């Protein structure tokens, strides 16, 4: 027997129901946002930070294509599109010094310490590494936000942007599922936002089990998991219903 769908706001508007795990979730696209996390050369392109640090980025191309599809559908349905770029200033002041755990745990910073010739090239604002991949181009009306840590809510105006627009539902895509995507969704959960991940529009940093573990955590404890085709179907005109 199917579980009932969830609806956070019954105050009216054009609503749609997205089939997801562990249950369907109902939302108003015009009061929702698609969050595109860190689709930069650093994370999705050979020669970028993840590749140079020893992570496999060979299967990111389908993810890029799926994000293109999801963004197009979301924009047509009136959803706000928010793009994140992870990184720091050219001097890495924003990355933190030895007194910051980020200094010790960031694989980008560790890679540059091991390979000094890369200093200033990884995740530095203005660098090729920091730029979004060529296939994904923000459009007028989209919002592009820099972030200095894994979570898109930390030291950014994201929560204020969402609350000022009455946005409670967030649909996540991007890289890496087990790091910045999950971190941002978790923080959103603590701030009373409903988070959905489109699993085929995300990619892990590390082995495949890291992707599976992150999705398990999300659907079991923090949010919902769906896919791009189901998301696009939910945003088709025939899927909308007015809820009084």
From Swiss-Prot:
It is an enzyme of class 3 (hydrolase). One of its GO terms (molecular function) is hydrolase activity, acting on carbon-nitrogen (but not peptide) bonds, in linear amides. It comes from the Bacteria. The active site is at residues 38, 147, 180. It catalyses: (Z)-3-ureidoacrylate + H2O + H(+) = (Z)-3-aminoacrylate + NH4(+) + CO2; (Z)-3-ureidoacrylate + H2O = (Z)-3-aminoacrylate + carbamate + H(+); (Z)-2-methylureidoacrylate + H2O + H(+) = (Z)-2-methylaminoacrylate + NH4(+) + CO2. Its EC number is 3.5.1.110. Signal peptide: none annotated. Induction: Up-regulated by the nitrogen regulatory protein C (NtrC also called GlnG) and repressed by RutR. Hydrolyzes ureidoacrylate to form aminoacrylate and carbamate. The carbamate hydrolyzes spontaneously, thereby releasing one of the nitrogen atoms of the pyrimidine ring as ammonia and one of its carbon atoms as CO2. Keywords: Hydrolase. The lineage of its organism: Bacteria, Pseudomonadati, Pseudomonadota, Gammaproteobacteria, Enterobacterales. HAMAP family: RutB. This is Ureidoacrylate amidohydrolase RutB. GO terms for biological process: nitrogen utilization; uracil catabolic process. Belongs to the isochorismatase family. RutB subfamily.
């Amino acid at each position: 027997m199917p579980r009932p769908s969830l609806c956070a706001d019954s105050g009216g508007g054009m609503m749609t129901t997205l089939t997801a795990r562990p249950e369907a979730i109902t939302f108003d696209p015009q009061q929702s946002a698609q969050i595109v996390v860190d689709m930069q050369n650093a994370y999705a392109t050979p020669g970028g930070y993840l590749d140079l640090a020893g992570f496999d980025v060979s299967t990111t191309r389908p993810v890029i294509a799926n994000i293109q599809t999801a963004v197009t559908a979301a924009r047509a349905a009136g959803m706000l599109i928010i793009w994140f770029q992870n990184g720091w200033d050219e001097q890495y002041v924003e990355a933190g010094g030895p007194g910051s755990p980020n200094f010790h745990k960031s694989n980008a910073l560790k890679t540059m310490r091991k390979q000094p010739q890369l200093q200033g090239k990884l995740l530095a604002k203005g660098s090729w590494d920091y730029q979004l991949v060529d296939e994904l181009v923000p459009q007028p009306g989209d919002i592009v936000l820099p972030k200095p840590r894994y979570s898109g809510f930390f030291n950014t105006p994201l929560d204020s942007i969402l609350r000022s627009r009455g946005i409670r539902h967030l649909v996540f895509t991007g890289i890496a599922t087990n790091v910045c995507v999950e971190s941002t969704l978790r923080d959103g959960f603590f701030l009373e936002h409903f988070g959905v991940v489109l699993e085929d529009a995300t990619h892990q940093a590390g082995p495949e089990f890291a992707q599976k573990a992150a999705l398990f955590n999300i659907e079991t404890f923090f949010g919902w998991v769906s896919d791009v085709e189901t998301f696009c179907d939910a945003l088709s005109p025939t899927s909308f219903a007015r809820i009084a």
